Amino acid sequence: MKKKFYIYVGLLLAIIAGSFLWISRQKEEAKARVYEAKKSAPIHLTKAEFISKVANFTANQTDWKYLGDKPCVIDFYATWCGPCKMVAPILEDLASQYDGQIYIYKVDVDAEPEIAAAYGIQSIPTLFFCPMNGTPQISQGAMPKESFQKMITEVLLKK
């Protein structure tokens, strides 16, 4: 009788330990998936980040000089803007599709009005397609994903 009791207790403890290990592994995998998703998501920029990663518009207001190490797309948007909300999931998909090849930046014109004013942003969404050299190509309004892909391929990746 005692032998059966110890066997049942042992099995119960093994099941509990296995459950804890399985739950722990699931949490680690979920964290890894979240990290991967964040790694390839559009990057929201503040004024200081824009100046250090994209262009220092405070020091040089006449000439565009891109500071990044990869071409980029800059989305000037507002949280209340309908067309901007339509473009957002497209940019998330493109961030994953072109991960490692380009950056996709987002600038909230309400939170960062100085950046918007420096580049004359009056219509949103306004998108800058910034190659490594030369001036950015500018597009205003929402576009289908295929148009974004064409601009990225031709202007940024030059394929």
Language model features with spans:
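Thiol-based oxidoreductase modules, predominantly thioredoxin-like and allied folds used
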Residues: 76, 87-95, 99-114, 121
